[in-house]
Design a protein with these regions (language model features):
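N-terminal secretory signal peptides that target proteins for export/translocation
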Residues: 1-3
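Bacterial N-terminal signal peptides
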Residues: 7-19
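Formylglycine-dependent sulfatase
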Residues: 21-367
Length: 367
């Protein structure tokens, strides 16, 4: 196509985007990241086994992607998301390598909250920070507020979790979480996903004047899979495998419930109309759960940690009332590096300079 028509189209699109955003030139952004949730584990993606009515309704209100990819492991995926740069640039090529991401000096990486804060956004990270911790806590990467935990799949404290877990094993540090730099003990009656949700909704209430960026890094559905507060008691004669599968389903159902409650809170606060919500999984299904993650009786080859399709293909959708058409399915290829430039365009923020940003804004794909 000749250059002149391209320039005209670009100008028209920019004008359309400005009018869609409206008088409130800085929309809010809520980014929901599910842990170890593979593409076939949502009802809207055709899951045979799992029912996710709240997430499905949210997906159907916007644009759902069917070929969205990320790194197949938690740490590298989250580094890719937050920096918009591939691992060979950031150094986050493995879980352990994530601790070496450079935070200060000329070669420092720049993350999404740093970009958005420059144009007036309040920023919060609530949930799993994981392998990025050695490189600095969320507050050191531009988040005004953070609540993160170190339980790695143990969502009750060790006293409560030990009798529930296989072999009585307790992983990570489920007994504490960190709230704005202060380490706090998890009480016996506290369920980490509920604690995260409570903090997220309180933060939304406090920052409803906007604009804000909430990175809601959910704990579900990372293993070890333990009962949720809604799980039924053990069934007589139930095998360990059957119990594990039932509890995994319970965890997906509970995650779906929390997403529904978060959206309801945005509605209650009258924030939904001016908020872009993006939902995504951080990598494919965990190996133990991948065989049950089928669509039409077939599984996607590969799982978390694998370079096959199922390792990096993840659920992804975006919804923004008045901007994203309801029920649209997008089959274009996109990946997690696209989030930083997408959020920057939505916020009207310049991209970081002096570095290569591998991602490209998806805003035009949301139409």
């Amino acid at each position: 196509m000749p250059l002149r028509p391209l320039l005209v189209l670009s100008a028209v699109f920019s004008a359309c985007l400005s009018s869609l955003i409206g008088a409130n030139a800085k929309p809010n952004i809520v980014y929901i990241l599910a842990d170890d949730l593979g593409f076939p584990e949502l009802g809207c993606n055709g899951s045979d086994r799992y029912k996710t009515p709240n997430i499905d309704a949210l997906a159907n209100s916007g644009v759902r992607f069917t070929r969205f990819y990320t790194a197949p492991l938690c740490g590298p995926s989250r580094a890719l998301i937050l920096t918009g740069r591939y691992a060979f640039r950031s150094g986050a090529v493995t879980q352990d390598a994530c601790k070496t991401i450079i935070r200060t000096g000329e070669k420092a990486e720049v993350m999404i909250p740093n970009v958005l804060k420059k144009v007036g956004y309040a920023t919060a990270m609530i949930g799993k920070w994981g392998q990025l911790s050695p490189s600095g806590d969320p507050s050191q990467w531009g988040f005004d507020h953070d609540l993160h935990f170190k339980g790695s799949g143990m969502y009750w404290n060790s006293k409560v979790a030990k009798p529930m877990s296989e072999g009585g094993e307790v992983r990570g540090d489920p007994d504490t979480y960190v709230l704005d730099g202060k380490t706090i003990k998890v009480k016996d009656d506290e369920y980490i996903p509920d604690l995260l949700h409570k903090d997220a909704t309180a933060w939304l209430e406090a920052h409803k004047a906007g604009p804000f960026f909430l990175y809601y890094s959910m704990s579900h559905v990372h293993g070890e899979i333990l009962p949720t507060p809604d799980s039924a008691p053990a069934q007589k004669g139930e095998s360990e495998d059957a119990k594990r599968k039932r509890h995994y389903t319970d965890n997906i159902v509970y995650m779906d419930k929390l997403v529904g409650k978060l959206v309801a809170e945005l509605d209650r606060l009258k924030l939904r109309e001016n908020t872009l919500i993006v939902f995504m999984g951080d990598n494919g299904s965990a190996k133990a759960n991948a065989p049950d993650a089928t669509i039409g009786g077939k599984r996607i080859e590969g799982e978390k940690g694998s370079m096959k399709e199922g390792g990096g293909l993840v659920p992804f959708f975006a919804t923004w009332p008045g901007v994203t058409p309801a029920g649209k399915v997008n089959a274009n290829v996109a990946d997690a590096s696209d989030l930083l430039p997408t959020f920057a365009e939505v916020a009207g923020a310049p991209l970081p300079t002096g570095r290569v940003i591998d991602g490209r804004s998806l805003v035009s794909q949301f139409k």
